[in-house]
Amino acid sequence: MKRLLRSHAPKAAGLLLAAAALAACQPKPQPASSSASRAALPTMERIALGANACWFKSGDPAFKAYRLAPELNSFSGRPRILLVPRNSPESRPMLVIQAEGNPAKLDAFGPVMNEAISGRIATDVKRWANGGKGC
């Protein structure tokens, strides 16, 4: 019996080593990133980046009279971005876009949402909230 074990011991050790190496090569399960990316803060970060690029950096005339004022660090759990008058940033916001919860519940309100541009704002915000990058 000892002889049998001695003759197969190197094979068994090699097999164990191969199994351990194979297990180490397997991809580790990744945590679901979709739940994190659908939370309020990451959603509002995407919206702020999209709004800045498409509405302001591009020189879009529809947003020329406004300035973007992100308020993403919110202790209330409602990160938001504001559109304020360009020459009077301390004035009341003309548009508030905010999110809350996980998955994020979006809300957009203010005087600008009563103007013709409101449909475009709603479409853009939904696209960016869902991960779209375009304008």
Give the ranges of each region predicted by the language model:
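Sec-dependent bacterial lipoprotein signal peptides
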Residues: M1-C25
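Bacterial Sec signal peptide processing site at the extreme N-terminus
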Residues: A19-A39
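Sequence contexts marking disulfide-bonded cysteines in secreted/extracellular proteins
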Residues: Q26, A53-W55, G134
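Extracytoplasmic/periplasmic, Sec-exported soluble proteins
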Residues: S35-R46, F109, M113-I117
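Post-signal-peptide N-terminal segment of Sec-exported extracytoplasmic proteins
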Residues: L41-I81
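Mid-chain, structured segments of secreted extracytoplasmic proteins
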Residues: G77-V112
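C-terminal partner/receptor-binding element of secreted or periplasmic proteins
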Residues: K105-L106, P111-C135
